[in-house]
């Protein structure tokens, strides 16, 4: 599986290259050359799989440059009951009248963004280690995205996080989540202004090619 830019100015690249690039060089988003097809029989065979193994089955259609055994190990490391405080990872809680509630806030920061970020933390470390390189990630947040990213990437080899946030404009809970982390690869930067101004700084930095 290779990826192309939505703006058409990038040669096809595999998943691991796209992972480390962020935006495509032409400023577009990376999208699959084609969407994988999954048959009804395959979907039925996935029924009842543990969440980590289901995640592997889906991601293996997109991250085809990562060996299957390695990718399965990454999903199983990302989605554990110790991290998500639930054996089901995304527990389904029955309500009245045949309705159920799907829990997406069982992760370390209680935000649904933990679902994606925990896998990203594992796969970033995996790819960077095998390429013997490092990566600096600069982001802007008004709360839950920054927390989820920092908790997923804390302590990971080869990656450093620099997270900008608007000074005094996050909840006390979100500030405590982010600013209490003491990991050497996590750096919180409070920006005097609103979130958009913090995001503008990140966008300006992304235009600098060293």
Each language-model region and where it sits:
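Charged, compositionally biased N-terminal leader segments and the immediate start
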Residues: 1-26
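Accessory "access/gating" subregions that flank catalytic or transport cores
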Residues: 190-194, 200-201
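Cofactor-binding loop segments of dinucleotide-utilizing enzymes, especially the Rossmann-like FAD-
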Residues: 140-142, 164-166, 193
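Short coil/turn connectors at secondary-structure junctions
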Residues: 26, 96-98, 132-135, 156-161, ...
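Active-site-proximal loop->helix
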Residues: 147-189
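Well-ordered mid-protein domain cores that form the structural environment of catalytic cofactors
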Residues: 99-155
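N-terminal entrance/gating region of PLP-dependent enzymes' catalytic architecture
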Residues: 30-110
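Conserved small/polar residues in nucleotide/adenosyl-binding loops
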Residues: 208-210
């Amino acid at each position: 599986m290779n990826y192309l830019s939505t703006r058409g100015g990038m040669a096809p690249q595999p998943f691991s290259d796209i992972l480390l690039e962020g935006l495509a060089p032409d400023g577009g988003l990376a999208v699959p050359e084609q969407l994988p097809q999954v048959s009804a029989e395959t979907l039925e065979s996935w029924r009842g799989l543990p969440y980590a193994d289901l995640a592997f089955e889906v991601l293996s259609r997109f991250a085809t440059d990562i060996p299957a055994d390695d990718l399965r190990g990454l999903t199983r490391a990302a989605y554990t009951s110790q991290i998500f405080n639930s054996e089901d990872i995304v527990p389904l809680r029955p309500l009245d009248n045949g309705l159920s509630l799907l829990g997406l806030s069982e992760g370390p920061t209680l935000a649904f963004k933990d679902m994606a970020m925990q896998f990203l933390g594992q796969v970033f470390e995996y790819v960077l280690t095998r390429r013997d390189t490092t990566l600096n990630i600069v982001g802007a947040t008004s709360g839950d995205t920054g927390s989820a990213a920092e908790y997923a990437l804390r302590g990971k080899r080869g990656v450093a996080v620099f997270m900008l946030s608007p000074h005094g404009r996050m909840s006390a809970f979100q500030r405590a989540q982010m600013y209490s982390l003491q990991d050497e690869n996590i750096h919180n930067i409070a920006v005097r202004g609103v979130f958009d101004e913090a995001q503008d700084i990140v966008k300006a930095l992304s235009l600098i090619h060293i």
